[in-house]
Amino acid sequence: MSADFWCSSQRNKWQLSRQSLLEARRKVLLLERKMIQNGLIKDYPNIHYDFNMRIYLHNLLIKLGRRLNIRQVALATAEIYLNRFLTRVSLKEINVYLLVTTCLYVACKIEECPQHIRLIISEARNLWPEYIPHDVTKLAEFEFYLIEEMDSYLFLHHPYKSLIQIRDFLNENSAVFGFTLTDDELQNAWSLVNDSYITDLHLLLPPHIIAVASIYITIVLKKNLSAIRVNSSAVNSNGGPNSMMFNRNPDQNSMHIDDLMILANPSTPGSDLVNNLERTNFHDMKLDEETIKINKFMNFLDHSHINLDEVVEAMQDMINIYVQWNRYNEQGVKKALQVMLLNRQL
């Protein structure tokens, strides 16, 4: 394993451009059509690798991980494995419940918190008895399939480490930059990173960019939440993410999922912040404590030489999660998978 992201297989083999990712998915669709035409698989028009499916698979991983008390880093690794695998294989030719189980099984090995194969099969069967086989060799076979499709590149770098490094760096250099990350801010940023695994960001951008984007949302956009909340009553948040990662107390200093959705809504005042990072003039704001901290954070970004275009790109995708989550239809995805998987058993 490379201790340096820039020399790692994650950077050199599995960091894609948006164009190459689009091309990879186009190839999967072409392969899928050929397999349907040749009678190798059946066509299920309601099965798509869209945001509904991605959120559903994310929730499956979280659910199984909680039953096994898996560390967050292993869950994150499993989700990247899943995303990589689905750039090469169609959903219509696999059992997604077995895929989720296998990704978590392999991730636990790599992240040095291994789970016995019989235990993980047992817990998966408790959750999804109609889809997970008793035979542990099925998981072992899928493990080799998964590793082969990822070209055996399994070690990963995550934004969590970058978050901790930035927090520690700011603590050590507080006299220079004049601010530090509070525990609440770190937790909010950590939560944003957790949810970011639903997106393609971890196939597209370096981990430190995602970490900085999560801090930016937490520190800078928080300044505008009080004003935005005045208009937030018109936003319908039913069906939003059932995430334990966000503080839902009515604390004006806390980040809320509704706030992020409002920021992502182009019709909402203040929602153009993400698209105007470089043009934001914080000096025009009232110089209260939060604004001073924002100015100091922007000064830190200026000195960091971080690619701000990539930070903006990451922020847009991260905030968009919550817009998509608001439209999430779990029952539709669950029913479509049920029809596909149970028909295979007939």
UniProtKB/Swiss-Prot annotation:
Component of the SRB8-11 complex. The SRB8-11 complex is a regulatory module of the Mediator complex which is itself involved in regulation of basal and activated RNA polymerase II-dependent transcription. The SRB8-11 complex may be involved in the transcriptional repression of a subset of genes regulated by Mediator. It may inhibit the association of the Mediator complex with RNA polymerase II to form the holoenzyme complex. The SRB8-11 complex phosphorylates the C-terminal domain (CTD) of the largest subunit of RNA polymerase II. Signal peptide: none annotated. The keyword Nucleotide-binding does not apply. Pfam families: Cyclin_N. It comes from the Eukaryota. This is RNA polymerase II holoenzyme cyclin-like subunit. It comes from Scheffersomyces stipitis (strain ATCC 58785 / CBS 6054 / NBRC 10063 / NRRL Y-11545) (Yeast). GO terms for cellular component: CKM complex; mediator complex. One of its GO terms (molecular function) is RNA polymerase II core promoter sequence-specific DNA binding. It is found in: Nucleus. The keyword Lyase does not apply. Keywords: Activator, Cyclin, Nucleus, Repressor, Transcription, Transcription regulation. Belongs to the cyclin family. Cyclin C subfamily. One of its GO terms (biological process) is cellular response to heat. Component of the SRB8-11 complex, a regulatory module of the Mediator complex. The lineage of its organism: Eukaryota, Fungi, Dikarya, Ascomycota, Saccharomycotina. Residues 59-158 form the Cyclin N-terminal domain.
